[in-house]
Regions:
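Ribosome large-subunit tunnel/peptidyl-transferase-proximal elements
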Residues: 1-91, 106-117
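Short, solvent-exposed loop/turn elements at beta->coil junctions and helix N-caps
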Residues: 98-103
Length: 117
């Protein structure tokens, strides 16, 4: 049974998966919108929503917690100065996932993940 199994494995080991999610999170923060597979988009949403909620505190502890996941200082700066202030009044639901069809090579379902304005 699959009870209480919250995160997807994405066909990778744990270090590869955490690197993938960190890189996708950095791309989403810098570009505000990315296209990826639907499953990866759902996993990135879990990661990025937690990071934005932490970043809304905007103190040293929050910066250190975000730096554990996002090792990019420029992306961290964008998160704290541009993205998190927009969502101070919002409790979750900072991103939107829109299905865009299937990839030509392997018919993987694609989706666009973006920040809600």
């Amino acid at each position: 049974m699959r009870h209480k199994k919250l995160k997807g494995k994405l066909g990778r080991n744990s270090s590869h998966r955490s690197s993938l999610l960190a890189n996708l999170s950095i791309s989403l923060i810098t570009h505000k919108k990315i296209e990826t597979t639907f499953t990866k988009a759902k996993e990135v949403r879990r990661c990025i929503e937690k990071l934005i909620t932490i970043a809304k505190n905007n103190n040293l502890q929050a910066q250190r917690e975000v730096q554990k996941v996002i090792k990019n200082k420029q992306a961290s700066k964008i998160l704290f100065e541009e993205i998190s202030p927009k969502y101070l009044e919002r409790n979750g639901g900072y991103t939107r996932i829109v299905k865009t069809g299937f990839r030509k090579g392997d018919s993987a379902p694609l989706a666009i993940i973006e920040f809600i304005e």
